[in-house]
Amino acid sequence: MAKINVYSLKGDITEEIELPEIFEEEYRPDVIKRAVISMQTARIQPWGTDPMAGKRTTAESFGSGRGAAMVPRVKGSSKAAFVPQAIGGRKAHPPRVNTIYHEKINKKERTLAIRSAIAATANKELVEQRGHQVSELEQIPFVIDDEIETVKTTKETREIFKDLGIMDDIVRAKKGRKIKSGKGKLRGRKYRTPKGPLVVVGNDRGISLGARNHAGVDVVEVNNINAELLAPGTHAGRLTIYTKSAIEKLGDLFQKNRS
């Protein structure tokens, strides 16, 4: 197995560890895409119109022979009703609540996708293709001491990220923040922010509080890691910072023959 350096919070090398075999997994963008889309579609809430909308009327057609279109008309009036082309009528093909949006995926396929996406975080070419700023990083993947798990303030994490050389990527995410198009702006989701570094920890002892105010940064415990965090938008190769304990747990969590 390949060996990799572990860095302190100041950016100094403290020790050397072996990478688990999961980082040698074949890159499978097709499987990764399926896993991410499965997660995205699982969040879609089915919605539809009232099945009786536009149908609450006693309108009936006069029939033929009157020199007028044979559409249902309100009794005592010539006003058309019920049909899609009438004002207040039903919709022709409305959305239905029984539509199935979720694209399911097999458990072993999902595990393969996560393994492949984890391996992609060690591929510098893929990380750069995603647009991450990695010129100051001495190695990919980047492994840091478990001490970072206890950091709880934005001020502390800012200094740590500067010392580690990943602040450039956070600045890129902050500058890339744009106002969305569409009505989402009115519904509490005005901005689109590019994804920055992902911090994978063995145990979250406060780091999520310290890192959450940095643009594009996500923190996840290794037990909860998934394909969408590793490959946002179905594109693998996210800049990922692992703690030493997270690296040690990875091999056991996603074994190759595990169902």
From Swiss-Prot:
This is Large ribosomal subunit protein uL4. Pfam families: Ribosomal_L4. One of its GO terms (molecular function) is rRNA binding. Part of the 50S ribosomal subunit. HAMAP family: Ribosomal_uL4_A. Disulfide bonds: none annotated. GO terms for biological process: translation. Keywords: Ribonucleoprotein, Ribosomal protein, RNA-binding, rRNA-binding. The gene is rpl4. One of the primary rRNA binding proteins, this protein initially binds near the 5'-end of the 23S rRNA. It is important during the early stages of 50S assembly. It makes multiple contacts with different domains of the 23S rRNA in the assembled 50S subunit and ribosome. Forms part of the polypeptide exit tunnel. GO terms for cellular component: ribonucleoprotein complex; ribosome. Transmembrane segments: none annotated. Residues 47-67 are annotated as: Disordered. It comes from Methanosphaera stadtmanae (strain ATCC 43021 / DSM 3091 / JCM 11832 / MCB-3). Belongs to the universal ribosomal protein uL4 family.
